[in-house]
Amino acid sequence: MINRKQGCIINISSIWGEIGASCECLYSITKAGVDALTKSLAKELGPSNIRVNSIAPGIINTRMNNHLSDEEKEDIKEDIPLEKIGEPEDIAKCVEWLIEDNYTTGQVISINGGWSI
């Protein structure tokens, strides 16, 4: 990418990197580290026209969350302003946008239905 003077790196972090999760300290710390890495690399690689961004999903309807009971999912939805759990397509649309865009770098984009506000 550096030799070609162009590129796009998209990291995946998590809402827990921003707000922290009880009983998930290590997970939260590593996701916050991904966000810091994203910003640092954006500064370092920007002169080579390489954009670096991160997507921080909230609760998304994936296998990772299959362990949640229906009751737990309903409790979570109550804390989300859009009152729903995200779908993988929500993340995919953001990835597509970041690939096509040519001026966004160093950003951590939260896709969580407003949960982090």
Residue ranges, per PLM feature:
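Conserved catalytic-site region of short-chain dehydrogenase/reductase
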Residues: G17-I19, I117
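Catalytic Tyr-x(3-8)-Lys segment
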Residues: D70-D90
